Regions:
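Short regulatory helix/loop adjacent to the ATP-binding pocket of P-loop NTPases
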Residues: 127-129, 156-172
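Substrate-engagement module of ASCE P-loop NTPases
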Residues: 100-109, 134-149
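Conserved AAA+ ATPase "SRH/arginine-finger" region at the nucleotide-binding site
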Residues: 174-179
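Walker A/P-loop
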Residues: 31-72
C-alpha cells in the first residue's frame, strides 16, 4: 500500500547499523515503559546527536535477538518518515490521508511499534494553508486502543515549545531523558 512509502521497518535494517553501545539504562527503561499498561509510549528527549534514533535500532536488535520480555517478542519497529509524508501535501487532507493509511496498515499488524523522530512536528503538523490541523489528534484513537505502541523522540527545546502544550500527548507518553 501507499504507507510503505512513509515507513521503514527497523528490524529489517539492522545489518546496516552499528550495535548500540553504552545505552543499556535508556534501553531498559524504554522496554519497561513499552510493557506497562498505561502511559506505555516512551518519549526520548535529548540534544541533537545524542543517539535517540540509535536507541530505536537498539531495541529492534534486542527484539530480533529475543532478548526482550514476552510481551515485546515478535514486535516490529517502524520508523515514520515525516519529511516525505509532509512533502508535496498541498492540502491538509493529503497529509491526513497519508497518516491514516499508515496507521491503518500498522493496526492490521500485530505488535507494531511506530517510531516517530522529531515527534513535535506532528503537533501542529499539516498546518498548510488556512486550515490548521493537529496530527496528534489523529494518533489519539490509536494511543488509546494501544494496539500500536509509539516511541517518540524530540529535543528539550522542541519538547518545551510544542510537545508539552499537547496535554493529550503528554498524558500518553513517558519521558525518558537521553544524556
Amino acid at each position: 500500500g501507499i504507507s510503505k512509502n512513509f515507513i521503514t521497518c527497523l528490524n529489517e535494517q539492522l545489518e546496516n547499523h552499528n550495535p548500540l553501545i553504552g545505552r543499556e539504562m535508556e534501553l531498559e527503561r524504554t522496554i519497561e515503559v513499552l510493557c506497562r499498561k498505561d502511559k506505555n509510549n516512551p518519549l526520548h528527549i535529548g540534544e541533537p546527536g545524542v543517539g535517540k534514533t540509535a536507541l530505536a535500532y537498539g531495541l529492534a536488535a534486542r527484539i530480533e535477538a529475543g532478548e526482550v520480555p514476552e510481551r515485546l517478542k515478535g514486535s516490529r519497529i517502524y520508523e515514520l518518515d515525516l519529511g516525505s509524508m509532509l512533502a508535496g501535501t498541498q492540502y491538509r487532507g493529503d497529509f491526513e490521508q497519508r497518516l491514516k493509511s499508515v496507521m491503518k496498515s500498522l493496526s492490521a499488524e500485530k505488535k507494531a511499534i511506530l517510531y516517530i523522530d522529531e515527534i513535535h512536528n506532528l503537533i501542529g503538523a499539516g498546518q498548510i494553508g488556512d486550515g490548521s490541523m493537529d496530527a496528534s489528534n489523529m494518533l489519539k484513537p490509536y494511543l488509546e486502543q494501544g494496539d500500536i505502541r509509539f516511541i517518540g523522540s524530540t529535543t528539550y527545546e522542541e519538547y518545551n515549545r510544542y510537545f508539552s502544550r499537547s496535554k493529550g500527548m503528554v498524558r500518553r507518553f513517558q519521558q525518558i531523558d537521553i544524556q
